[in-house]
């Protein structure tokens, strides 16, 4: 029996990159998965096709034969966040695992950052996570079940990142949200943890990948000497979503090749 067989997982922002990798790994471990996207339906459908290729059975005769389902939602809108949770439950009948992966960043010197950009980052990276988690926990309480919450943070919950101050603040907030909820939700049998990736080879880093000088400088800061892959993050998420991690909560796990302890600002 696979570790996540019979479980249903929602992964926000999962049409590409790290989120896509997480969806595929959870499906490989037997979970049915909800693939969320904001503005990339083609990526969501491509992810769904890969999930369907993995195979597997639904846990009820009423649900589709595939293991996957796509839902559009903007995580910067609380109304859409709540509807995303509701639609996921309506489709599969329940939710067991929530992976808060969706995130955005805005580049600007601190003294030039606009209120609109600040709000955009905070709404997705922190506010959206807060209310998605709240709706998920309400579902677990109503159905008298336990569950797993995994937040995708960043090494920048600890590392300064000049010109991305709002992003760093959002990830620092996510760290404390996780710690606080581990205490508040522990008695309910609900665990919550952060996974903090470093430099991962994804579409969001295309500009970096095409700049040999900057890429070389970054690699010199990574003791393992390479960029991470989505599967590096996904494997840890799958572990934290399983019963093998039943006694782990309130922690941040860095997936960064050692970058955090060897970082020198370029």
Language-model features, listed with the residues they occupy:
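Conserved glycine-rich cofactor-binding loop
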Residues: 8, 15-17
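Short C-terminal tail/terminal secondary-structure segment
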Residues: 159, 238, 249-266
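Substrate-binding pocket helix/loop in short-chain dehydrogenase/reductase
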Residues: 109-110, 114-122, 218
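Active-site loop immediately N-terminal to the catalytic Tyr-X3-Lys motif
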Residues: 111, 159-165, 187-188, 225, ...
């Amino acid at each position: 029996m696979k570790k996540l067989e019979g479980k249903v997982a929602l992964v926000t922002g999962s049409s590409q990159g790290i989120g896509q990798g997480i969806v595929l790994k959870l499906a490989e471990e037997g979970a049915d998965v909800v693939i969320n996207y904001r503005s990339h339906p083609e990526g969501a459908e491509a992810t769904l096709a890969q999930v369907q290729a993995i195979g597997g059975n639904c846990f009820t005769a009423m649900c589709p034969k595939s293991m996957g389902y796509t839902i559009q939602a903007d995580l910067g809108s609380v109304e859409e966040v709540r509807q995303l949770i509701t639609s996921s439950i309506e489709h599969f009948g329940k939710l067991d695992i929530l992976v808060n992966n969706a995130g955005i960043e805005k580049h600007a010197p601190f003294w030039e950052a606009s209120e609109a950009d600040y709000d955009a980052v905070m709404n997705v990276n922190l506010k959206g996570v807060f209310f998605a988690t709240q709706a998920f926990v309400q579902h677990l309480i109503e159905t008298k079940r336990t569950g797993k919450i995994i937040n995708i943070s960043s090494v920048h919950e600890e590392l300064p990142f000049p010109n991305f101050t709002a992003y760093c603040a959002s990830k620092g907030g996510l760290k404390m949200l996780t710690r606080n909820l581990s205490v508040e939700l522990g008695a309910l049998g609900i665990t919550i943890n952060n996974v903090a990736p470093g430099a991962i080879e994804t579409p969001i880093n295309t500009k970096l990948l095409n700049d040999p000088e900057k890429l070389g400088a970054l690699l010199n800061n990574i003791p393992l000497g390479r960029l991470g892959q989505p599967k590096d993050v996904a494997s840890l998420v799958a572990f934290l979503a399983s019963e093998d991690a039943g006694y782990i909560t309130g922690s941040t796990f860095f997936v960064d090749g050692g970058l955090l302890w060897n970082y020198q600002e370029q």
